[in-house]
Amino acid sequence: GLIDLDYTIKKNVSNLADFKNTNPSELTACLLDRPRHKKIIDELKELKVNIVLISDGDVSGALLVSKPEYKVDIFLGIGGGPEGVLAASALDCYDCHFQGRFIFDKDKDIKEARDMGITDMEKKYELSEIIKGDSIFCATAITDCLPTKSNDKDVNALNKIVKDKNNIFLTETLITCLLYTSDA
């Protein structure tokens, strides 16, 4: 694969740059602005990759890879399991690559995973293992998903936040849908 959870950051960046026929310094990576991502951020800086840090909205952050106008090439890091499933559902509609792996902080989490039928606690899940059929995703922005820190000031926001126009509240909703049909 081009990008893989088991590859180093350097290998993933190098593979992506080669695929896009560009230099790592022309790539933009998006991550949640969290202390747990310090090592990843340091490695990206060493490779001279442009970095966009967002304060929250990991689903929105993941979606920034879906279209060129968002100017994000890769979203990576550690986030929540439910958010990963939501991001996978949305990215499925854009034919994007996604991998995820559970990280268990407590024995209670492992027990809950086993109760849900998960037997391999180290398993790397491909998008097709997370989303196994039709995929519909809707997202309405309540808060802004603009970068908290970025060395690329041209990154575009995914959705506009709620606007108050004389007590009429306007929202913008992103809807993605991928339905599989059969000839049977």
Question: In which residue ranges do the predicted regions lie?
Answer:
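Short acidic, glycine/serine/threonine-rich loops at helix termini
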Residues: 40-44, 64-67, 86-91, 148-152
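General beta-strand structural signal in soluble alpha/beta enzymes
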Residues: 31-32, 51-55, 77-78, 138-139
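Solvent-exposed alpha-helices and their adjacent loops that cap or buttress functional pockets
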Residues: 19-24, 43-46, 65-70, 127-132, ...
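A conserved acidic, glycine/proline-rich C-terminal tail/linker
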Residues: 138-162
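Acidic beta-strand-loop-alpha-helix segment within the catalytic core
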Residues: 1-53, 174
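Gly/Ser/Thr-rich active-site loops/lids in small-molecule metabolic enzymes
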Residues: 55-59, 72, 79, 83-113
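Conserved small/polar residues in nucleotide/adenosyl-binding loops
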Residues: 180-184
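A two-mode feature
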Residues: 109-142, 147
